[in-house]
Structures are given as C-alpha cells and as structure tokens.
Amino acid sequence: MNSSSASITYASRKRRKPVQKTVKPVPAEGIKSNPSKRHRDRLNTELDRLASLLPFPQDVVNKLDKLSVLRLSVSYLRAKSFFDVALKSTPADRNGVQDNCRTKFREGLNLQEGEFLLQALNGFVLVVTTDALVFYASSTIQDYLGFQQSDVIHQSVYELIHTEDRAEFQRQLHWALNPSQCPDSGQKMDEANGLSQPAVYYNPDQVPPENSSSMERCFVCRLRCLLDNSSGFLAMNFQGRLKYLHGQNKKGKDGSILPPQLALFAIATPLQPPSILEIRTKNFIFRTKHKLDFTPTGCDAKGRIVLGYTEAELCMRGSGYQFIHAADMLYCAEYHIRMIKTGESGLIVFRLLTKDNRWTWVQSNARLVYKNGRPDYIIATQRPLTDEEGTEHLRKRNLKLPFMFTTGEAVLYEVTNPFPPIMDPLPIRTKNGAGGKDSATKSTLSKDFLNPSSLLNAMMQQDESIYLYPASSSTPFERNFFSDSQNECSNWQNNVAPMGSDDILKHEQIGQSQEMNPTLSGDHAGLFPDNRNSDLYSIMKHLGIDFEDIKHMQQNEEFFRTDFSGEDDFRDIDLTDEILTYVEDSLNKSALGCSGYHPQQSMALNPSCMVQEHLQLEQQEQRQQHQKHRAVEQQQLCQKMQHMQVNGMFANWSSNQSGPFNCPQPDLQQYDVFSDVPGTSQEFPYKSEIDTMPYAQNFIPCSQSVLPPHSKGTQLDFPIGDFEPAPYPTTSSNLEDFVTCLQVPQSQRHGLNPQSAIVTPQTCYTGAVSMYQCQPEAQHSHVAQMQYNPTVPGPQAFLNKFQNGGVLNETYPAELNSINNTQPTTHLHPSEARPFSDLTSSGFL
C-alpha cells in the first residue's frame, strides 16, 4: 500500500499541441514512397477529421493530442447513446419499442445544453460510473477546479480526489455503501491509485429500485484545484443519487450484453459558498496567447469584454509588458523567466491596463506550449480580481520583494530614476521652463538607446496619463472652473446692488473680468476652444460632465446668491464693547442694589397682590436705603448716553422668548425720591426737553420694563467721546411726570433675551433717558414720535438710517422676552388708557 501511495499522481495538464501538417506534393510516378509514412499520414488525416467532429471549441480542439482525440470520441459516443435511451419517457421505449409520433416530435426539438442553466448552478455536473470513470463533466468545472472539460472526461476520478478521500468516494459509489462485499467474480486492483475496483456487474433485480431513498447520496470530499494556490484542493459537496446508465451496450466475458449499471449523478458545489464578487468574476476567466517574449498574439471573447480591446488593438502595440503596471513589471518578469525554465509560471497577481486607462487586478497562470520538442508560444489564463483582493496580494508581495523604482525607494540606493519627467514624483522645474525642455530632450534621446524588448522601453512607451490620471482628474477641473466661477459670481454680486458713484467703476471691473474669463461669460461652446482632444476634456467626458453641466452649476450658484444678496450682514458692523460694558455694569449694580434680587425667590407677578400693605412697607424700606445711590448712577448714565446720540440701542422686541428673566422691581412710588434728594434739579439738566413731551398722570405696574435685546447678533456702532454734562436743566418732578407716560399696559409682558449684551431692571429711568437724544445744542427740537409696532419694523430700516448718517429712529423688530416682578406694586395714579397712542414704547432699553 505504501509503495503504491508513493507513486500516486494527480491530474494535470498533459496535452501537447499536434504538429501542424503541411500538404506535400504527390511524388512523381516511379519514385518509391515509404509505406509506413503513408500509413501515418493517413492516420493523422483521419484523426484531424475526427477531432473536427468533436463538440468542443476550435481553440480546445487544436490543443488535443491523438490519444485525447480518441478518448473524447469514445466518451461522446457513449454520452450520445445514453441520451438516446434516457430521453425516452417509458420503460417500453427504453427496451426498443419506439412510438412513431413521439419520435417525429423529438426530432423537431433541438435539445442542447443550456449555457445559462449551467451558470445558474453553484457548481458543476459530474457523472461517475461504478468503475470510477468520469462519464460526463459540465464545462463549468473550469470555473471551480481550473481543468478543462476535455481534461477530465473519460479519465479516472481518483486523479482529481485527495488521497485521504478516495476510499470514501469509492464507498459512495456502491449501492450498499459497502464495496468490500463483492460477489464471486472477485476484484481488480488499481495500482496507480491503490484502490480495488469491482470487476463485477450487478443485475437490476439484485439492487434496490432506482427511485429508492437508499440511492440518494450527499457527501464531501476534496478535489484537485488548479485555481487554489494555498493547498491545491477545494472541498466540494456532492449531492445526487445513483441511477442506471442506459445504452452502454457493454458485453461480458462470454459475449453477452450486460444490463445497465449504476452511476453517480451529482452536482458538486463548493463547501464554502463563494461571495457575490467571486460569483461575478468567475464567469470572466479569459485566455490570451503570447509569443515567448510575452507579445500578445490573440485573445478570446471574454478577454475582449474585460479589457475592452479588440484583438487587433491588443496585438499591434508590441510587448505585452506595455499593458502591465510599472510596479508589477519586475514581478511578472521574474515569473516569466520561471515559466521559460519550468514550462509553467504558477499563479501570479498583477494589474493590467484596460482600454479606458484603468487598472484591473487579474490572477494569471501562464504555461508554455511546445512544438517539435521546443517552446512555441505562451497561453495565459487570467481571472479578474476585485481591488480589495489585488491590494491584499500587493501587500503580501511587498513583504518579500526588494525596493523598487515604482515605490520611490530606489533613492535610498542612489539609483537613477528611469521614469520620464512627467512621471517623476519630484520634478525639477525652472521659471522659464528650460529645465523641462532639456529633460524632455534627454528622455527622447534615452529612448533611442533603449533595447526595444527591455522592460524600461516598455515602460517608457506607456502613456504618462495612466499613472497621473486618478490624481489629476479633479485638479484642473477645479482650478479652471470653480476658481473662475467664484470670481465671476463675486463680480456679478457687486453689479446687482451698485451704490452711488461706484457704478461706473464696478461696471468696468465686470467688463474686465469678462474679458479675462471669456470661457465663463460667453457661450459654453467657447469653453476651451480647439481643446476637445485635451486631457481635461477627456477627464470631464469620463466623469460624465459636459459644458452644459458647468453652465447649470454657475446658474444655480448665481440663483442662490440672488436669494441672499438683499440681506445685509450686520455682523460687519463693529460693536463698541466699552460703552455697552459700562451701561451693563451700571445697570446691574443698581438692579442688585435697589431691589435685592434673589433668583431663587423669584415668582410670577400676581395683580391681586398689588394691594397688600406689607409688601409696600418692604419696598419703602428698600427705597430709603438706595435712593441717593441710584440718583448718582442715573446721572452718570445720562452723561454717557448723551454722547451716544441715539434714541435706542437694541433692535428687536420679542414676545415669544422662552425663559423669563425674573427680577424684583420697586414700586412706582420710588420716583418721589427725586424731590427729597437735594441737588436733584442741578444733577439732571434735562428740563427743557422733558417739558416739551406730553404725558398722562397714570401709573401701571412696571414689570415690563427691561432692555429689549437686539436679535440674532445685530451689532450697532456708537461714537465714543468724552463724557460732558449737558447744559440743560431739569427737575425731579418733570422727570417723574415723564416716567409715567412711558408705562405700557399691564397685560403686556416683555421678556429679555439672555443673549443680550445689556440687562437692567431700571425701567423708568432708562426709558426716560433713551426716549430722546441728549444733544448739547442750544435749540431744543421736539423729537418725532413713532407709533409702537413691535412686529413690523426690521433691521433693514435701522441699517439704512445708520448708513445714511441720520438719526436712528425707534424701530425694532418684533422680539419680546418676558420678565416677572416678584414684588407687586401699587398705583400712584389710576391705570387709564394712554392718551398718546403714537408714543413709542421702544424707548425701553
């Protein structure tokens, strides 16, 4: 057993292409010819005619030797005889009784093997007789094992099976799963495989029926695989049943016709299901024919689909290394030399150039074909791979191979870079471009001295764009289009809203920009004139981008710019942080000092609590403690606001702001303190302006008086100057009277935006100050009053007044926040309707 197992061989490609025959002239009469030679010539002619009748492609038939032609001819005749009997539906027909009607009907049918049906199977069809001969194998066996259909038909199946699985396969071929139990006729040994093959034939009466469940088979064994470079075997699952093989007409030793014998009809599928990508690529295995120097001379139909070249385009370019990536040339050359020495290269993975200048990973196996004992040409079988598989093979290869020019690591060894200047990753350029011309001249001269069959010459003949294409596909596109479109759109935006005397200048600039960018201002047909064959145009065409698309992109960009061009950006206006910080600090101090503000004790204002006497007493005590302090601070605030020359500082009222700002407010009786403070009339010099303002003698709760915040980052610019006291006298009584007219109805609640830069509870004072401008002029003019409308005005009117240098009117957008007073107040005067409805309440800061 050991001696026999030592000589076990597996199936391999052993075919040799037959010698091409040439028709020789018939010798003249009288000249004797060799009878044996005439016999050989006659035999070769018959074999060629027999090979032409085989149902195989012509490229397969041309590679068959004489024994293979005879073997396949016998197999074809046996298969044809089987189908002639098996396609008959009744047992009577199988015994030779034929129905004329059915025969005529079947003659009209052209029953052929469906190619799509075989591709739909996740495996291949295999029929094995009980004496271990492959009766039939479908053509899809090549996709899984790498063997041609003609390689395995009518060969021993044990040449394909792993040695450890051969006994199990033999057991599955027996109807009782016990091949050791043999009848009286004995066994014969297969010396090559070390297995006993039964030489006995069973009578159908001795075995179970054909449709019995005991005839079903499902098992796993390993088959020889030429496509697997790890172990060389592929685990396959065989699922089928034992059936009778009809129409073989075998005879026994006594010359009697034997009954049909059993055979295994099964579908072999890989034990591990292939991925979707493997299923997609398995049907694209193609073959190419090359000279000994790897110059392509032919390609099959699938190769033309994968690579995109016609056979003429593939053969006219010279060396096949021009289609190989520069980083894979030395790798392929190494296996090329190995193939010349050993006859087969083995499995290698590299990149091939397609017609659309893309690289595709392939797994190839090349072998030599001999003629008259000498190498004649090369047949390469390639299988497309995915980018992930190719990258993984490249990573494994880099761990073994030395440094190469293509990776830039040859600089470590001071080796001259063989790349042309455009492929150099670090080209040396001069300002006048002379260096580029010199290098191009040198590269042209170097090509003349290169060996035409060398790898360097093949690489120099490659187009540089195949290496630069992925990296440079977007650079020129963005540079020529997006940068210019931004400049054009910016000029267009300036032309939309010209102001003042700048119209002529801006129109001139737009005209100049259109002259400098004729590709964008004119029709798209003018883009890149006479450059339809340029690299940029080819890149755009490959990406599916046309000049119409670029025109639409520009129109879309201009459309969106038009929608937002009317909105002014208030963030461009500088904010005077110094003034706002001062106002905020002073107001916060007075708020905390006078009202005793405690956030934890805040509660909503209740009108019913305004009549409680104990709250009034508490407010009286608080006002007495801070009367003088507020008066001094209010004077400072007025002086500060005098130089602002504004009527209001914030822009938006909001009535829907969440998060109230709760701050206790003192009662409106606090304004009586000005009559008690000495020197008040001298400290508030605003008598004349306040006297001109009508008011009403009514007070309402002041819980609404807060500073309205400016909305959404609106920034205002105020002049900064020295703070000087104004020369206008005033009295505390007039100030108190003016405060009363600034009150709003109790039902209105205003909130404070937490993002506001200024927060203060000093409602009445700040309202009195900000209602009119504090201008140090001799003539006291009455300021125009505007009706309170918190929803209509917007930031545009405020900005127009600010840009034109005019007086800032009291117009604010509608944003109001709510603030609650924790201490209810009492009315000094009955709450009545405001007699002056046109008085704006936007004076509240």
From Swiss-Prot:
Nuclear export signal (motif): residue ranges: 64-72
Residues of the bHLH domain: 27-80
Span of domain PAS: 110-180, 274-341
Biased amino acid composition, Polar residues: 1-10
Pfam families named in the record: HLH, PAS, PAS_3
Residues making up the propeptide: 1-10
Cellular-component GO terms for this entry: cytoplasm; cytosol; nuclear aryl hydrocarbon receptor complex; nucleus
Domain PAC: 347-385
Nuclear localization signal 2, short sequence motif: residues: 37-42
Bilayer-crossing regions: none
Motif extent (Nuclear localization signal 1): 13-16
GO term, biological process aspect, one: negative regulation of DNA-templated transcription
Keywords: Activator, ADP-ribosylation, Biological rhythms, Cell cycle, Cytoplasm, DNA-binding, Nucleus, Receptor, Repeat, Repressor, Transcription, Transcription regulation
Protein name as catalogued: Aryl hydrocarbon receptor
Species in which this protein is naturally found: Delphinapterus leucas
